[in-house]
Amino acid sequence: MAKVCYSCGKGPSFGNARSHSLRATRRRWNPNLQKVRIREGGATKRVWVCASCLKGFKVQKAVRPVPAAEA
């Protein structure tokens, strides 16, 4: 599976790196992808999500249950 955002589908973009003499060489710009655990359909899964989707709360992160304190 390619490294693309699970939420928005953002992947690498391609273009040219330009030197001072304007010689063009191909390069790629990668999105800021983070591997996070999300809840989906009652199940927890680890997926790649871009930082802008995490900041915009477009995915629901999974939280680990806190064990009950013994009294």
UniProtKB/Swiss-Prot annotation:
InterPro entries: Bacterial_rp_bL28, Ribosomal_bL28, Ribosomal_bL28/bL31-like_sf, Ribosomal_bL28_bact-type, Ribosomal_bL28_sf
Keywords associated with the record: Ribonucleoprotein, Ribosomal protein
GO cellular component: ribonucleoprotein complex; ribosome
Domain of life from the UniProt record: Bacteria
Gene Ontology biological process terms from the UniProt entry: translation
Family named by the database record: Belongs to the bacterial ribosomal protein bL28 family.
Protein name, entry field: Large ribosomal subunit protein bL28
Annotated organism of origin: Rubrobacter xylanophilus (strain DSM 9941 / JCM 11954 / NBRC 16129 / PRD-1)
Gene this chain is encoded by: rpmB
